[in-house]
């Protein structure tokens, strides 16, 4: 069971456009994630925030994907659908408290380190560029992250151990753009 915003850090292999991000709604994504965790009764389903990936490209209104697994096997489990539906409805029935949005950089597709760092904090993930896409992270894409969130992105949150060989280049890029960054291992 997962929540994420759509977008492509590189080539658009699953819809959308190359190197284009949809508009994120960090506080609502976090609220839905929390509701799914609270409502999840399925033993074989992990609840995760995923990195930004796939299309479509939506740039007029904030959007997100709330997903049940990645195959027909998971999609056909009625209880999973009920958990997702009730979680989304519960979240939408609340007054969403604006959080401080952050740009996640590095780590796995399912963002365990970044999610853990923000889950019980005042912060919420906007876009997340995972380790496998860091080579596509350039000045244009970083600027796009800060432009394509309906809430102000406060800083970049680095999955320090999940940045690999791109770490130095990305830090230099963030410093060049005067973007504050924090390390997950220091939070």
Regions found by a protein language model. Give the residues of each.
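Solvent-exposed alpha-helices and their adjacent loops that cap or buttress functional pockets
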Residues: 39-41, 56-60, 95-97, 149-150
């Amino acid at each position: 069971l997962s929540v994420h915003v759509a977008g492509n850090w590189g080539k658009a292999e699953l819809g959308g456009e190359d190197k284009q991000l949809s508009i994120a709604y960090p506080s609502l994504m976090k609220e839905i994630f929390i509701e799914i965790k609270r409502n999840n009764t399925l033993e074989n389903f992990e609840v995760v925030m995923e990195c930004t990936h796939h299309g479509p490209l939506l740039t007029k209104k904030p959007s997100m994907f709330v997903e049940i697994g990645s195959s027909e096997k998971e999609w056909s489990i009625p209880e999973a659908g009920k958990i997702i539906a009730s979680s989304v409805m519960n979240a939408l029935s609340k007054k969403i408290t604006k959080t401080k949005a952050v740009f996640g950089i590095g780590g796995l597709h399912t963002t365990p380190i970044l999610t853990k760092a923000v889950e019980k904090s005042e912060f919420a993930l906007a876009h997340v560029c995972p380790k496998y896409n860091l080579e596509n992270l350039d000045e244009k894409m970083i600027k796009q992250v800060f432009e394509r969130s309906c809430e102000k992105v406060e800083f970049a949150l680095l999955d320090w151990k999940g940045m690999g060989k791109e770490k130095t280049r990305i830090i230099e890029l963030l410093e060049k753009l005067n973007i504050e960054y924090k390390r997950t291992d220091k939070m």
